[in-house]
């Protein structure tokens, strides 16, 4: 957030912000922690995680300041994030915003995600950055039991700029974001 995103913690829903969509809604504590460290949420919000009427439900909801999209069925966040990127491209003459989407294995097994991704590649949405957490597991178990898709190859065929990195290495993540912002694709 602090190094790459356009985000004002005093106005977390400002129109001029970058968008972040967690298609993997169960990872919302990561977002809530960042919002807490950015002074958007309070410790009491984190302590009430997954409680009824909490500002920190078990999947993100837009009623929480700083949350850009509700999480729903697998793959929905991919379509929502791509839709945001399309809208920003169409509505802004000098589009300076980025849309970031975090997806997992289960998301990419859903046709809604792949259809939206194909459209994004076709339309060359260059201000869209998607992180794919390929850990070879989804809710039903290991992905090799039900899926043998080479997603890097598939996304390259859909005209995406694909970078495969170690997601635990901050420098690799940093360099990948910098490179993604330089590529017009």
Predicted regions and their residues:
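N-terminal amphipathic, basic-rich helices that act as targeting or association modules
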Residues: 1-36
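Acidic-glycine-rich active-site phosphate/pyrophosphate-binding loop
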Residues: 6-7, 43-63, 91
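Residues that form or immediately flank small-molecule/cofactor binding pockets and catalytic motifs
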Residues: 25, 54, 167
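Generic detector of well-ordered alpha-helical segments enriched in charged/polar residues
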Residues: 32, 46-50, 174
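Glycine-rich ThDP/TPP pyrophosphate-binding loop and its adjacent helix/strand module
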Residues: 9, 17, 60-185
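Generic surface-pattern signal
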Residues: 36, 51-54, 182
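Alpha-helix initiation and N-capping motif
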Residues: 28, 42-46, 125, 148
């Amino acid at each position: 957030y602090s190094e790459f995103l356009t985000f004002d913690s005093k106005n977390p829903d400002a129109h001029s912000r970058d968008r972040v969509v967690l298609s993997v809604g169960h990872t919302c504590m990561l977002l809530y922690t960042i919002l807490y460290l950015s002074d958007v949420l309070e410790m009491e919000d984190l302590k009430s995680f997954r409680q009824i009427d909490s500002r920190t439900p078990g999947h993100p909801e837009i009623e929480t300041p700083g949350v850009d999209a509700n999480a729903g069925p697998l793959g929905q966040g991919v379509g929502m994030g791509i839709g945001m990127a399309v809208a920003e491209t169409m509505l802004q003459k000098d589009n300076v915003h980025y849309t970031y989407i975090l997806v997992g294995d289960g998301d990419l097994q859903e046709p809604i995600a792949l259809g939206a991704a194909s459209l994004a590649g076709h339309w060359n949405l260059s201000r869209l950055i998607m992180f794919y957490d390929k850990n070879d597991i989804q809710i039903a178990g290991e992905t090799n039991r039900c899926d043998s898709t080479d997603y890097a190859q598939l996304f390259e065929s859909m005209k995406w700029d694909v970078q495969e990195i170690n997601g635990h290495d901050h420098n690799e993540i940093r360099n990948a974001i910098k490179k993604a912002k330089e590529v017009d694709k």
